[in-house]
Amino acid sequence: MAGEEVKEIDEFEELGFEPATEETPKKKKKEKIIRSIEDLPGVGPATAEKLREAGYDTLEAIAVASPIELKEVAGISEGTALKIIQAARKAANLGTFMRADEYLKKRATIGRISTGSKSLDKLLGGGIETQAITEVFGEFGSGKTQLAHTLAVMVQLPPEEGGLNGSVIWIDTENTFRPERIREIAQNRGLDPDEVLKHIYVARAFNSNHQMLLVQQAEDKIKELLNTDRPVKLLIVDSLTSHFRSEYIGRGALAERQQKLAKHLADLHRLANLYDIAVFVTNQVQARPDAFFGDPTRPIGGHILAHSATLRVYLRKGKGGKRIARLIDAPHLPEGEAVFSITEKGIED
């Protein structure tokens, strides 16, 4: 009997198992190391291919996705999607608590793009921030698109001159992008205009669905340039709300419009945070018929946009061709105003 028992144990060990005895306790199963999306639980080759095709090709991209998004693109259950996201967050070290002093150090790594105006830069805490959405709204001719053109040039400067050595993605919804204006600003700031134009990638959006699709496609260009000497550091949407405003008319369409706008803004936030880029959007205004005192204008987009934009700046015309920028909302800055001019250099004091 003893011989048979030894034989059974030997056969057990030949299969690659170690018998658990009092002297040799059972070994704990090693936790799987997750380095790519294929390593995530519930992600097989077919699911991984679907995720990659939809742009979810990194742990970070999956970690900041919603279960409903993954469910739709990968054809999986919402429960499986949630487990995949939770595993990605753990592997990418996202969604965990951080001490405030450590968060302050992280904030110190945020880049800033000069607007070309020292007074406006001061108002914004040093310029347009990466990892944030900056919304500028105002009436026609207030300087929104001029500021966008200036930023598209300034971001290409080295950090010591107010830039980030970066490229630009520009989503144009109103046919207002002008390469001639970019050339003029670049020339008057001592830059090679042809080189500046080479690092601006422009797409015209013809409706709100196309606009949202272009934001998704922008991620491909961001990834393509990520490890080059000119990574994308600025994404401009000029204007953010024009298509949504014209396509969804009346109170009956308001809920659907706001849902789509919220999804659009969530996509922009994800790109800003995931790839350390500055998102700059312009917005239109409308008159408030019930306003009897003060400025009767208000930005389009309602509470959805008000809560989604990190910084909100209101532009208006001043005397003598000057423009006045008022910081309406920012989580870390006080309200205030700055005066600037629009010249052949773009925006300046």
From Swiss-Prot:
InterPro entries: AAA+_ATPase, DNA_recomb/repair_Rad51_C, DNA_recomb/repair_RadA, DNA_recomb/repair_RecA-like, DNA_repair_Rad51/TF_NusA_a-hlx, Hlx-hairpin-Hlx_DNA-bd_motif, P-loop_NTPase, RecA_ATP-bd
Presence of the UniProt keyword Nucleotide-binding in the record: yes
SUPFAM superfamilies: P-loop containing nucleoside triphosphate hydrolases (SSF52540), Rad51 N-terminal domain-like (SSF47794)
GO molecular function: ATP binding; ATP hydrolysis activity; ATP-dependent DNA damage sensor activity; damaged DNA binding
Record bears the keyword ATP-binding: yes
SMART domains: AAA, HhH1
GO-annotated biological processes: DNA recombination; DNA repair
Pfam families reported for this sequence: HHH_5, Rad51
Record's keyword terms, sorted: ATP-binding, DNA damage, DNA recombination, DNA-binding, Nucleotide-binding
Binding, ATP: G138, E139, F140, G141, S142, G143, K144, T145
Listed Acidic residues bias regions: 7-16
Region called Disordered, residue ranges: 1-32
Family: Belongs to the eukaryotic RecA-like protein family.
Function: Involved in DNA repair and in homologous recombination. Binds and assemble on single-stranded DNA to form a nucleoprotein filament. Hydrolyzes ATP in a ssDNA-dependent manner and promotes DNA strand exchange between homologous DNA molecules.
NCBIfam families in alphabetical order: PRK04301.1, recomb_radA
Protein name listed in UniProt: DNA repair and recombination protein RadA
Organism expressing this protein natively: Pyrococcus furiosus (strain ATCC 43587 / DSM 3638 / JCM 8422 / Vc1)
